[in-house]
Amino acid sequence: MNRQLWCWDIECYVNFFCVTFQDANTGQKHYYEVSSRIDQSKDLRIFLEFLSGYLVSFNGIEYDDIILSYWYQEQPSLQELKAFSDSVINRNEEAYKYYKWLKCFPSLKSIDLFRYWSKMLRLSKKISLKSLGIQLGYHTVQELPYHHTTVLTEDQMEEVKYYNYEHDLNILKLLYEALKDQVELRFSVEEQYKIKCISDDAPKIALKLIGQEIEKHIPDYKDLRTYRPEIKLADILLDYNFTEASMLYKIDKKMVVCSNYYTLYNLLKQQTIKTTTELAYSVILPNPNGTYLKNDHGTGGIHGVTSQKVWKESNTHIIKDYDVSSLYPRTILNNRFIPEHLNPYFYDVYSSIVERRLKAKREKDKVTDATMKIVINGSYGLMGNEYVFLYDLQQVVAT
């Protein structure tokens, strides 16, 4: 489908405001400036009145969309616009909540690529347009030339104009091209499942799709959670016939290091926890060549910890890579590790989603395959998020 998409970005100073729009299909740019040296307000307003389609931004929902809406509706002075911009930067939501979501532009919708990363990942990785520009191999990565409190000279205005028009827009366009398949997937999900998700990360899409199915059985599902004062691991550990071995372990930097899995299993059976941070175990395994492999265990899975080595195939040894297909969903379904407050409906919904994905893969239905994959991969982690309706920490630990 041929959609009109515009990459865009703004800069705001006490005596300078500029915005650049770039046609995502043709690459053509439109630059507008309102400053102490030039006033293109009328031209910008005319452009906006005829503009339609999607505005592609990086953090636009939390900044650019709001600034543009305020400017368009209130026709502020540059000083008033800068003061408003500061309130947005400082997250004074009472001052700007009326201007969110491009409500004054009914023919425009926002696509915020920043939100394609989950909120926790955005914070922990400190994701920025500049850092992504480096990863994408853009030739010039530059910070804003002057602090946003600076009163710009005309020469400085030219620098900021070039920074906005050239580098920021080029990196944003490059990022859009890199994420184009993900953008198109969200368009397909919106059309097929009738949910709004064009600026959602994968976990949010998973929540909306699962919620759509759960709501048929539990209308008030969004308010439900399963809270537990403690989790006895003996109640959720699966039976396993280990070969009996010596119980050997030590404590190293708050981690329990076990000599074998028999020791790990028996220590876990004795433990009662309240949070997942209490699970910190390692197992040391001997390799046939006399070396050792250390496996770290936590709620995030099993991770091998090894020093850097070069491994080569020989006449007697080959290197093989194995992957367990749909490990988490199969573990959840086979053992019914499902949120207690959604029992039994979640099992049926989740099982149906897994089967729909397998069917889509066989039939090469890429949209359904990718959509169901988002739901499947997102569900496990969401069970550990107390702010969403899937929350039941015991199921995260059990899985």
Predicted ranges, named:
Residues 14-19:
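Short N-terminal binding/cap micro-motifs at the start of the first secondary-structure element
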Residues 1, 6, 13, 25-62, ...:
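Conserved acidic
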Residues 20-24:
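A generic structural motif
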